[in-house]
Amino acid sequence: MPINIPKNLPAGEHLREEKIFVMEEDRARTQQIRPLNILILNLMPEKEKTELQLLRLLGNTPLQVNITFLNTATHESKNVSKSHLQLFYTTFNQIRHRRYDGMIITGAPVEKMPFEEVNYWQEIAEIMDWSKKNVTSVLHICWGAQAALYHHYGIGKIELSAKCSGVYSHVITDLTVDLVRGFSDLFTAPHSRYTSVSIDEVRNHPDLRLLSYSEDAGVFIVQSKDNKNIMITGHLEYDATTLADEYSRDVAKGIDINVPVNYFPNDDPEKEPMNTWRAHTHLLFSNWLNYYVYQETPYEWDFVDEIEYHI
């Protein structure tokens, strides 16, 4: 089934070239089915790349999906044009009266800062509080995952001595959980971060379930026991070359950075990396949309009534 995107969104052309079924808003209105409404809070600096990565995954399921892109009002993005934000993004005040079937909160390049020192933290915290009643399930990625663990569950982050960057092997703690249904016993996933969280704090928290971890990269997939929040500390959505692009960027800036581990053939940055995590990425997003969003959300679920809105 198609993914419904805003008219003239640049990612649409790339998705069509990849044979992913997309529809623009005008055509989607004629479909006599109830689509899923997904809100994406895109905090990544290169927003158009992240849009394409996420839409590629959301568009590869049997479900019709409507997408709303959300941008922070309290922080001005520097790596995307104002016209792009005006055309394709909205702010929290414009959508807070609505309900959404699912929501994605991306990573952000602010992980070394204490949460309260991030200039849009209060806005992020308000959005996360709002999501408790107005979103069926929220998928948090990298910094977004750490922000959720901190805000909802009181688990702080730990600064690492060196950047965790590369493709790591992971195990599943419980293959019967719907989110990881169909996963292999051992699978790979990319990480790109300077901070982590305590695996013991996650394991011992009464409201959380540790679903996947790596001996080298630590906590990977965490699920709240009420299925409301999914936290993924890595970047399953990354393209094959994203870690290479980040590495080249940091080297050009003169940053003392290690070569991403288990990524380049023979650890040679001159060689083309391969994507070894693509299948599990599609599987996780499909499982999330099916088991945690589609099967859990009410059919009539859109606008918040006035009484609940003011609670």
Curated annotation (Swiss-Prot):
**Mind telling me which GO cellular component terms the entry cites?**
cytoplasm
One Pfam assignment: HTS
What processes in GO biological process is this protein linked to?
A: L-methionine biosynthetic process from homoserine via O-succinyl-L-homoserine and cystathionine
Q: Which residues participate directly in catalysis?
A: C142 (acyl-thioester intermediate), H235 (proton acceptor), E237
Q: Which GO terms describe its molecular function?
A: homoserine O-acetyltransferase activity; homoserine O-succinyltransferase activity
Q: Which reaction does it catalyse?
A: L-homoserine + acetyl-CoA = O-acetyl-L-homoserine + CoA
Q: What is its main location?
A: cytoplasm
Q: What are the protein's UniProt keywords?
A: Acyltransferase, Amino-acid biosynthesis, Cytoplasm, Methionine biosynthesis, Transferase
**Compartments reported by the entry:** Cytoplasm
Pathway per its UniProt entry is:
Amino-acid biosynthesis; L-methionine biosynthesis via de novo pathway; O-acetyl-L-homoserine from L-homoserine: step 1/1
Q: Where is this site: Important for acyl-CoA specificity?
A: E111
Q: What is its EC number?
A: 2.3.1.31
Keyword Zinc present in the record's keywords: the answer is: no
Into which EC class is this enzyme placed?
A: transferase
Task: Indicate whether Cytoplasm appears among the record's keywords.
Answer: yes
State where substrate binds. K163, S192, R249
Site feature Important for substrate specificity, where: S192
Protein family membership: Belongs to the MetA family.
What does the protein in this record do? Transfers an acetyl group from acetyl-CoA to L-homoserine, forming acetyl-L-homoserine.
Name the chain's protein.
Homoserine O-acetyltransferase
Organism, by scientific name, is: Lysinibacillus sphaericus (strain C3-41)
| Name of the encoding gene | metAA
